[in-house]
Curated annotation (Swiss-Prot):
Pfam families: GatC (PF02686). It comes from the Bacteria. Belongs to the GatC family. The lineage of its organism: Bacteria, Bacillati, Bacillota, Clostridia, Natranaerobiales. Keywords: ATP-binding, Ligase, Nucleotide-binding, Protein biosynthesis. HAMAP family: GatC. Residues 55-83 are annotated as: Disordered. Residues 55-67 have a biased composition (Basic and acidic residues). It is an enzyme of class 6 (ligase). GO terms for molecular function: asparaginyl-tRNA synthase (glutamine-hydrolyzing) activity; ATP binding; glutaminyl-tRNA synthase (glutamine-hydrolyzing) activity. InterPro entries: Asp/Glu-ADT_sf_sub_c (IPR036113), GatC (IPR003837). One of its GO terms (biological process) is glutaminyl-tRNAGln biosynthesis via transamidation. This is Aspartyl/glutamyl-tRNA(Asn/Gln) amidotransferase subunit C. Allows the formation of correctly charged Asn-tRNA(Asn) or Gln-tRNA(Gln) through the transamidation of misacylated Asp-tRNA(Asn) or Glu-tRNA(Gln) in organisms which lack either or both of asparaginyl-tRNA or glutaminyl-tRNA synthetases. The reaction takes place in the presence of glutamine and ATP through an activated phospho-Asp-tRNA(Asn) or phospho-Glu-tRNA(Gln).
Amino acid sequence: MKVSKEEVLHVAKLGQLDLDQEEVEMFQDKLSQILEWQEKLDELDLEGLEPTAHALERRNVTREDQVHNSLTNDKALENAPETEGNYFKVPRIIE
């Protein structure tokens, strides 16, 4: 299915996007490609398949927490250009 220039401009207007001619053509191609893929999916025989939101049945798969050795404060701060107490000191970026 070919998406028209007018359809791309309509969607751009809904999204308050200002597209130039090159972008309109690019989106025409991309949206047309997406719709062609959807048409291919529509051809699949899905009779007897249950609707699903996920390909796998797994839910909330977690692992046990494991304690690992970590750096001491002194070791972590060893190569820092500036420190203040037990913290890295970094330049202020917000006034």
